[in-house]
């Protein structure tokens, strides 16, 4: 590739990651305020999306992955928030695909007893603003099966350990990188025997720019 070609000609290639972070990833006070408001609204839309599913199932109205995705898109548009691409709505096995996206032609119906993942994000218009981005799962029924509850408990423990490590580092004046927090989460997951099912990194950075990733 290009990197190998340049190196073959003699120059030493170094990463520009630190330069990019200082120049492009600094948040202004306005960006922080807009991000917090976007997070609040994204959480509200998440609640509305699960209520949309609950209401549809309770009233025997057809509900699908694509239908929920479209509901989320319309709700963000109504609020004047931007998305860079549609939300992820995955049912059962599709919830295990980190980059799954339903379409009008390929969409699974949501039924009683299904496991539903919703990953959604939005921001106030403008690349100077930062996306709010969250992922939630829910069970379409009155009682979550023990097997799924057990896995959720493990994931929640991993999440809490990461937050605890962040707080500890903050109070201690310690700098952390993303891979170190990913390792904290992986250690918990692997410790419970689910290491091979950990198919995606733990989260991603957020900052100003054209995309949520």
Regions found by a protein language model. Name each.
Residues 1-213:
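Active-site neighborhoods and metal-handling regions in enzymes and metal-associated proteins
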């Amino acid at each position: 590739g290009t990197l190998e070609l340049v190196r073959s000609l003699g120059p030493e290639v170094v990463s520009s990651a630190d330069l990019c972070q200082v120049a492009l990833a600094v948040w202004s006070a306005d960006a922080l305020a807009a991000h917090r408001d976007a997070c609040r609204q994204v959480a509200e839309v998440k609640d509305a999306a699960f209520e949309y599913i609950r209401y549809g199932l309770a009233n025997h109205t057809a509900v699908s992955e694509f239908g929920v995705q479209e509901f989320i898109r319309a709700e963000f548009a109504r609020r004047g928030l931007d998305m860079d691409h549609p939300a992820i709505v995955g049912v059962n096995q599709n919830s295990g695909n980190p980059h799954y996206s339903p379409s009008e032609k390929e969409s699974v119906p949501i039924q009683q007893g299904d496991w539903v993942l919703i990953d959604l994000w939005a921001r106030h218009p403008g690349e100077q603003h930062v996306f709010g981005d969250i992922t939630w799962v829910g069970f379409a029924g009155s009682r979550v099966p023990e097997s799924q509850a057990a896995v959720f408990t493990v994931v929640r423990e991993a999440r809490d350990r990461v937050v605890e490590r962040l707080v500890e580092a903050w109070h201690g004046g310690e700098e952390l990188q993303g891979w170190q927090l990913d390792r904290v989460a992986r250690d918990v997951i692997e410790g419970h025997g689910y290491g091979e099912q950990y198919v995606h990194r733990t989260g991603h950075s957020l900052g100003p720019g054209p995309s949520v990733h």
